[in-house]
Amino acid sequence: MKKTFYLIVFLIAGTLGNLSAQMTLFKGTFDEAMKKAQQEKKDLFVDFYADWCGPCKVMASEVFTLPEVGDFFNSHFVCIQINVEAANNKEIAKKYNVTALPTMVFISHDGKELRRVQGAVPPDALIKEAKIATGEELSFEQLYDKYKKKKNDFDVQQQLLLEAPMFIMTQDGYNRQKWGARIDGLFPEYLKNKKIERMTNCADFLILTMYHRTTSKDDPIFDYIAKNFDKFAQGVAKDVEGDGKLEVARYLISMNNSYIIQLCKKGDINYKKRLARVNGDLKEAYAGISFGSLSVYDAITLLADATYSLYRHDENAFFDKMDAYFIGKGDSTALNDYTQPLQDLAVVYEGNMSENAYRKCTNWIAKALTFDMPADTRTRLLMMMGDCLKNTGEPAKAKQSYNQAFIVSAEIENKMMMQQLQQAIQESLQGL
């Protein structure tokens, strides 16, 4: 009996401990919350929400409940949720110009707005906004003013570049353009003055992945990282959990593959020279990738040759290369291996393929549908299957595929997307 009692007490204590760690929400009116904030010499954090608002629910259930959020907010703010649709809250929502949900406003105990956040944000971003509101951290604008006074301070420049994307996303119209132009000019300046040789650390590597996302024939940044792969990997690994080599390899591979495909689509035969780097100075970066029985070089060569052939409208060569790729990759073939070439075919031929191409696509789609995938992806694949069957003289099977697509579309969470796809399906059915 004692053991049972202690177990129950332990479980209750654990539950209460979890609850106390999350954000404490004041139960009462806005005016009562303001009075409490004045008494406790705290500021006010107001979460304006509505019952129908999905992002509001995400913030309430996945962010406000986190211990790190609760610890900071409970010690610095009186926190309250205000339902904007309640009649007694209309005036307060109007006063603080709530035009989108969720809107979270930091308010001083004398009623002055300190800062606001619109839309769902991750916990670290919300805590940062709270620290800016309390004056513990600089706002982005204040940080930029600091940079203008100390233009040789690499730490300030680094922080600006890291914070810029999130900040710019919150801006509209002219302000977004203004700040975008300022940051676009800051990155080359930072790179020129600090030098790539001194950027072998996690923060600077992140900046490179944010602002240098494409490569070209002459790219000293790409070439330096490729030449100093181990040095960069070690520098990144010091500051992050996980494998620094993997992070640097992904960066190089993504840019190199994209450039190869870009050359293929343009019909530039120099893609073969770029392919040679896969077995050359980029060999270590590509070492962790598996393509079934194919070597990395052979697999990427098949995909590149297939893309080159497709954009030259050499249909037979395209399918031959892709079939060889699928055979070589075998059981490790993934969903994207099918969906990407299907998408490329749709772009190049704009729905006007040969009967042989439609039959080939039917086979690929059937294999793709065996994988797990989101409802919108499955809906689109079933619609494509219907199109292929329609163009190979099988209207009954096409109708069946369109109907199946309509049923699956009901599972799509994004209602606007669901309605658009359902309308397209109905038009396809009418066209049979």
Name what the model sees in each region.
Residues 1-25:
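Bacterial Sec-dependent N-terminal signal peptides
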Residues 22-40:
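N-terminal leader/targeting and pre-domain segments
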Residues 23-28, 48, 62-89, 98, ...:
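Thiol-based oxidoreductase modules, predominantly thioredoxin-like and allied folds used
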Residues 40-54:
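Short active-site neighborhood of thiol/selenol oxidoreductases, capturing the structured segment around
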Residues 40-44, 75-78, 101, 108-112:
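Loop/turn elements at helix/coil->beta-strand transitions in domains of secreted/extracellular proteins
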Residues 57-61:
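Detector for the c-type heme attachment site
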Residues 99-139:
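Non-catalytic, surface beta->alpha helical segment in thiol-disulfide oxidoreductase systems
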Residues 151-432:
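Oxidative protein folding and maturation machinery
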